[in-house]
Amino acid sequence: MWDLYINNSTCDPKDLAAKTGDDARNEFLNKKAVFYQNGTWEYTQLIDGGLTDDDMTMLPIYFGVGDEANQGLCTGTENYWCVNKEADEADIQATLDFMDWCVTSDEGTKCMADDMGFNIPFKKAQESKNLFIKEDKQMTEDGKTPVAWNFSTMPSEEWKNGVGSALTAYAADQTDANWDAVVSAFVDGWASEYKLANE
């Protein structure tokens, strides 16, 4: 999949390290790119950039394995809301009140769903206008199986950075040796992080 991405991009693979998320969005908005991998949170920026619901859709990423006819979208997050138990009690309560407001009030759920593009899985949440959220919901209702993002099982940010660096080096110079370095960053890096966490 990585080779498919980097060798069919809007730029030379050697230049990918200098590209940003803004570059990718702008290439999509300016019709230089047909595909743009991102999430529901990107919807508002695409609409503000001039696209309409008729201009876009979301598709599962197919890998050619398993029962992909029943595959849904990749869903999840790598972030969580946390409250620092060491903070002042008044700050803790204010934070909890704000979090409650975000997911229970009309204004909060509208902001979360429409302005931020988040899927709000709470009973009091308003129906989102976000096309991507609607498409994900429809796929799930149609019996498609979402592909979970399991970020919480990744060993660390350091591990992600190591794999990312190896992938960047491979994109710039697509040799077997550089691909072996990607495999090593993934496998050996995971083993090292596991050892650090469990010894």
What would you call each of these model-derived segments?
Residues 141-199:
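Conserved C-terminal helix/tail region of periplasmic/extracytoplasmic solute-binding proteins
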Residues 1-18:
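Glycine-centered hinge/linker elements that transmit conformational signals in sensory
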Residues 8-10, 49-116:
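Extracytoplasmic/periplasmic substrate-recognition and gating elements
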